[in-house]
């Protein structure tokens, strides 16, 4: 009987601890102003990269260093990122301290036309590489806009908070192409993001907790 009570008390304690961790991560929070913020940016392929780089191009130099994460087979996004950063350096005068940037690659979580069932396994495989990367970087902010690669990255960022390592702010910006329905990544991450931004009023009506700022890319 005593052993049962001990097990029950232990289980209850673990449940309470888990809820405390989840409240810390998902509950109300306050952002403390800082001189710089370590930024992790998830870039997809094609239009996703174009949109996210437009957002990055409008950020101040306070968002530094910048860590870009792309799929390991995405050479086009790598070229666009290098071009943006080099252009930013060329436009700054010699006295300006421009942000440092790093490029990281992880396995793609879902290929084009890949079945939903098999994508579950590839996403877990991508997660195997994502968590150590996010743990090493320990970003202050994750910025993403819908590619499948952002799911394992954002889940990894959430885990840092649950494990008590660091509270990471997750900002998800739904693609401008999404007018009436969310992308699959959006449907998943709207529950995990600190700020879920949509660019059409129709989506704001469907998802009242989202943030609508008009077209931002």
Swiss-Prot record:
Lumenal side: 1-3
Protein family per UniProt: Belongs to the ALG14 family.
Oligomer and partners: Forms with ALG13 the active heterodimeric UDP-N-acetylglucosamine transferase complex.
UniProt entry tagged with the keyword rRNA-binding: no
Organism listed in the record: Mus musculus (Mouse)
GO BP: dolichol-linked oligosaccharide biosynthetic process; protein N-linked glycosylation
Listed GO CC annotations: cytoplasmic side of endoplasmic reticulum membrane; UDP-N-acetylglucosamine transferase complex
Protein name as catalogued: UDP-N-acetylglucosamine transferase subunit ALG14
Origin superkingdom: Eukaryota
